[in-house]
Amino acid sequence: FILGASKSGKSSLEKVLGQSPKVQSFYECLRPDSQIYSNPKKPDQPVNSALRRDNLSISDLFYGNENLLTSDGIEVVTCSNPFAIHSIITLAEALPNASFVFMSRNPMDVAADIFTTEYNASNYYAYDPYSIMEYINWYQDFWDILKEKIPESTLTINFECLMKTPHKIAEQLEVFLSTDIELT
């Protein structure tokens, strides 16, 4: 799962990794019918706690069949859906092999990109500089806590390094994920 504030480089990382025949990028496509995700639009709707004790399959989360992906040589799937952050604990418990990658980018660059983006809906924070910085800081604070709780499942990737040396970032991910990504 690729995490980070809007405009932090999550999609850029997925595009780089998507060059590999061993990686399936699901981008922001999560199954809306999966009971594992709490609905941010209905915060009082609880996550199905029974799923927290069970292992999940790829098809429980995405529109993909784990057996078909495996037979096609896929070893890594990625997701950059921003709502996944609301269910990190559930994901970490129900997917023992899940990894969480945080895209780190200069906060002022992120803020400038957010401020100049005209969003179609929501993202009301994007039109006030103070709110933008609160939003960016919240992601960083969240990531710092997550790294403390599950350090073996977390990795921080620097956006600027990704742009300059994508193959080095791929090598870093190969070590972290214990797999050969084989970028083309």
Q: Would you name each region that the model predicts?
A:
Residues 1-61:
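PAPS-dependent sulfotransferase catalytic core
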Residues 23, 30-32, 37-44, 72-184:
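PAPS-dependent sulfotransferase catalytic domain
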Residues 62-63, 139:
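Hydrophobic residues within well-ordered alpha-helices
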Residues 68-69:
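Conserved motor-coupling elements within RecA-like helicase/translocase cores
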